[in-house]
């Protein structure tokens, strides 16, 4: 009789252990999903910020280059006009 009770108790303990393990696995899966979601979101924000800074830097460089080219062309035209004016005098 006690052997049957021991076997029944062992089966009950095994069943409770299995259910507890399944619950723990489910909880860990949820935590992992949440952590991965936060990591993905953080990574996406970091990439977006890096792209934004690169674009701003590129825009600034393009503005500087445009100003330099404009000034160079303006100076060349002014110099040419002054030279032509001197030739005409």
From Swiss-Prot:
What InterPro entries does the record point to? FAM25
- The domain of life for this entry's organism is Eukaryota
**Gene symbol?**
FAM25A
By sequence similarity, the record places it as follows:
Belongs to the FAM25 family.
A Pfam family that the UniProt record links to this protein: FAM25
This protein is called what?
Protein FAM25A
